[in-house]
Amino acid sequence: MDKYGLVLAGGGAKGIYQLGAWQALREIGVEFSIVVGVSVGSINGALIASDSFSEAKQLWEEASLDRGVSVARDLRNPEKLFSLKNIPVLLREVWKNGGIDASPTKDLLAEFIDEKKVRESGVDLGLITFSLTEYEPKEVFLRDIPEGQLLDYLLASSKVPGVSKIGPDDDKYLDGGVYDNTPVEMLLKNGYNRMIVIDISNMKGLAHKSVFNNSQIIYIRPNDIDDLGAAFDFSEEMFEKRFNMGYLDARKAFGLVSGRLFCFGKEVFREMIAKYGADACEQLEAFASETGVEKIKIYNKTDFMDALKAKYEEYKQQLAEEEKEQRFYSNILKKIPVSKDSNEYELAIEILEKN
């Protein structure tokens, strides 16, 4: 298999999604000639370039807001760090310490990223950061980074506004995602046209461009980025969810599983389309999503329909309790959550009623 270029978007704790995707790509046999990343994507990129999968898992298992930055204890809850009511507390931290001390992050990275191993891997590495001193982006490749300063450059690509200076020189740096959070152009400009993009954020950056050329680009990303949760949520529950989402979405991107909102074996989904029709299958997936059927697993037809019918029965019971005097079928069509069209799920309802 020919090697790909790899583009890794930034997105804080959502970066574990990229690790799950990487596991799937390793199983498929995908290899990379170059990896470019922004923010957490640059950190994952260094681990991927050096093929340090076990170290990457350990780093993410160790990662937390507590170990990532040094900040007042009452701000360490990810929901509190940037909340409006805590801005005065955050500003006091910045004023008192000259910024938020990011040195714990460097200590954490030093445990798991081996610069020598990265340099000897034969895989090129690139990152983007934004210089507040020069007010311009900096695209940097591994060959441009002095020996012993890789971690400083990775941190310079990942700067939260107000973070203390720990960059490669006297410049002040900001997260490179403000310029381009999905740096496809960085590869295209350097002659790479065959690439995989693992996207984990709705933020694109000031200079991001949509690519409309003959490049071969495979995108791996969730159907709904919001399913990845908050960028500072390092909880164990979200770790597992993001990892598994990345794994399944990568397999889907390479055609090993199928489905739009859910994951099915290729033959399973073909059989469902042959039996119910493409429009009905689209409705079944959408209805399953609306009613809360678990998405992060690979379904066969029986398991999927059983899970959907169970949710459908719960929904019928709820409607029956709320609208006992109305005709049930009519009520279903009118009461489907966030439905834009009263007939949006008509085919799905008919299938479920018959089964």
Can you say where each PLM-predicted feature lies in the sequence?
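Patatin-like phospholipase
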Residues: 1-38, 46-355
